[in-house]
């Protein structure tokens, strides 16, 4: 958005039949998280032509057994366009009995000339409320506590639990 204090509409962009979250990436690209068709996908679009958006990259993360809380809580998604990294909260359930097998987040890099690359993942206790970075560190706040780690070693997050 070239002028965030004075936004203006540029038209209607039809990208999916499901729920979709849009994240601007420069002037003419967007990254989307899409749960249409019982699948969770991340996509990158060139929207320089508003009437003809071009899908640049798409990655399916899983079927109906994987979900993301970004549709209910957009603050759970962290996107650092300067470092070309985003963090997406995910929950994976067993297809057999519906029990949660993974609750946490995936970390991706994105480059418009190369696509997406999953850099790692970290698990959390509780539902992710927000993810942010400060001074090169990655922080994740859930309804049960706060964790801190690095983008290079997300599986080594350490945290403290909130006391009730």
Question: What residue spans do the PLM features occupy?
Answer:
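Feature marking well-ordered beta-strand scaffolds used for ligand recognition
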Residues: 1-164
